[in-house]
From Swiss-Prot:
Record family assignment: Belongs to the rotavirus NSP3 family.
Protein name: Non-structural protein 3
Signal peptide (residue range): none
Listed GO biological process terms: regulation of translation
Oligomeric form and interacting partners: Homodimer. Interacts (via the coiled-coil region) with host ZC3H7B (via LD motif). Interacts with host EIF4G1.
Coiled-coil ranges per UniProt: 166-237
Principal subcellular localization: host cell
Dimerization, as annotated region: 150-206
Species in which this protein is naturally found: Rotavirus A (strain RVA/SA11-4F/G3P6[1]) (RV-A)
Function: Plays an important role in stimulating the translation of viral mRNAs. These mRNAs are capped but not polyadenylated, instead terminating in a conserved sequence 'GACC' at the 3' that is recognized by NSP3, which competes with host PABPC1 for EIF4G1 binding. The interaction between NSP3 and host EIF4G1 stabilizes the EIF4E-EIF4G1 interaction, thereby facilitating the initiation of capped mRNA translation.
Region (Interaction with host ZC3H7B) residue spans: 170-234
Amino acid sequence: MLKMESTQQMAVSIINSSFEAAVVAATSALENMGIEYDYQDIYSRVKNKFDFVMDDSGVKNNLIGKAITIDQALNNKFGSAIRNRNWLADTSRPAKLDEDVNKLRMMLSSKGIDQKMRVLNACFSVKRIPGKSSSIIKCTKLMRDKLERGEVEVDDSFVDEKMEVDTIDWKSRYEQLEQRFESLKSRVNEKYNNWVLKARKMNENMHSLQNVISQQQAHIAELQVYNNKLERDLQNKIGSLTSSIEWYLRSMELDPEIKADIEQQINSIDAINPLHAFDDLESVIRNLISDYDKLFLMFKGLIQRCNYQYSFGCE
């Protein structure tokens, strides 16, 4: 045995389940599109829109009303069921029509066409008079039925209102426009002057920066000249050094092969690049020290074979 309001409760449960399904569909669509969202924000937005559409379209009241009729029939109250006996003739056709009506109502509500606009459009129609700018407002059968049922009220506040004709003071309007123009002109001049000051300051900064760059370039040029002078001086010194060593070598009574070897090492010194020249000088000095060391060892061995002793220093 069903309770008194079991069908009505089932209808409310179906509406709530539809709302939850709408929330899940909205969040799933956002996730599939890769859009980040706030669940509470989506929930509140869908709830507000869902409640408005269901209430404004009359779908919620329609479903609950039918559920109440079924509950009354189940509880042996057949008055409402008898009034809707036409629904018992063929349930498939009324169900489809009712579904289409509810769908259209919700679609109109979602597009911003609310209940007031739908009722007014259903109660009135406008007929244009050919050749005139005026028109005739016609009442539909729905409006006539509402008048017969006493569902139309007259708001006297709109009837008693007096129409006031405003007189335009063109002089004051012109003065207002002139003040607005002067205010706009002063703001434009102020912005232009500020822009000129900024441009002038920027130009001064640019000239100052150009002067600094010019000074730095001049200083770099001086350093380059000084560096070239030092490089030439080093080249001359290296050339003089090699010439002096060659002259001194020729004055020595050494074996020609030794002289040729030393001259070859001296001629290998790079007189163009001072850095390479110092490396070459280091190599020549190392070779001379090595030759001197070998000569000393040979002389030491010769003295020892002759049973002589040697010592360093002066007595």
